[in-house]
């Protein structure tokens, strides 16, 4: 607005955002309903400072489904088409397990996460993250003697083999992925587990390598769960990428002023990032949503990002 010579106060802009989020909340709720019907959900969380909030540390949680890329229109009518791309943010005043349980509402599908214990208290089947496990060994590698290879190098190289398999089977169907993982990745995982068990007895438990080994062993059942279903991923990078736009934004605006503002941010970020994940221009999509929602339609499914037909703009 300022570039067009229109001066708007911070209060006015904030009020507009709050009102806009209220209008878009029905879309958010419908996306939430559909997300809980999916077989796999990825989740992550990040701190958020809220000035007028009793809690010293609040959090923005993210939950996402879908392949992390715009849908292929050629597969729109296929029975095995990928699940819808949905990215939803959920503002909470804590990082407790109750936050996850409230959002998931008894969801019993697969939940792919890092090793944070709050997720353990859900009804979901947890899937681990090899990217997190690998980072522990990268940290251990940094404290090795310079110029010498050690245990961390072996694990990093071994995990790299697992990722190369994933790159090679990326375009396969879920059924093909499952079969190929069991054929090619399972033997490598068995080797890794044997190495971890043996090495855990050879290193100081409080050393960097000892902590890395202990983390992988604690997470092992979750780490190898991606073998069970071809729809699962080897890591939780899907959620980490989904929460990154919010983290980048937070570096610019630093905090939310009120809990109402934080909740509005959750709705607005959700609509914007879900639009982007489905190949839509957020501004055009939100403009269309506001125009159509003003008509108070009986159903809003035709307005969801993978169903909507945006009007052509004539210049």
Describe every region a protein language model picked out.
Residues 1-315:
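Catalytic center-proximal scaffold of phosphoryl-transfer enzymes
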